[in-house]
């Protein structure tokens, strides 16, 4: 007996799960300095972190989430990339912290695109020449002839990331029993 995904949504869900697993294996092979993994609760929600080693964002670490459409990979709508902290960049909306992927991809084509394509777009955010073709007014309202001022804003957002990381460590230490906390501090 032949099952179609139209009549059997559970088969469609299983196929989607296998497709996401295959995409995860590709992500592990294709990317450097970007680490991503699908959520345990939902394969359509991925968590990631990017380590920037060059360019004006050198030394920065940015956490982000990727939300895939419900009908992934069949849907032509693009995934949504959301950064966990505000990033000053012309292709990242300062209000909702989303990356404008339309600059890199017009529509999702399941035979051509993979989940690592948005990650590659993120990797290319570090270049200063993109400031000449702005998408967001706040990031480009600054005078780019004064790179030190722009870099100062980048440094301040990097400090916000460090402060957030310190708060997470404090929260985690608050949950760890005292003897285990002391043992962890000694091992550092």
From Swiss-Prot:
<dbReference type="InterPro" id="IPR016135">
    <property type="entry name" value="UBQ-conjugating_enzyme/RWD"/>
</dbReference>
<dbReference type="InterPro" id="IPR000608">
    <property type="entry name" value="UBQ-conjugat_E2_core"/>
</dbReference>
<feature type="domain" description="UBC core">
    <location>
        <begin position="15"/>
        <end position="174"/>
    </location>
</feature>
<protein>
    <recommendedName>
        <fullName>Protein crossbronx-like</fullName>
    </recommendedName>
</protein>
<dbReference type="Pfam" id="PF00179">
    <property type="entry name" value="UQ_con"/>
</dbReference>
<comment type="similarity">
    <text>Belongs to the ubiquitin-conjugating enzyme family. FTS subfamily.</text>
</comment>
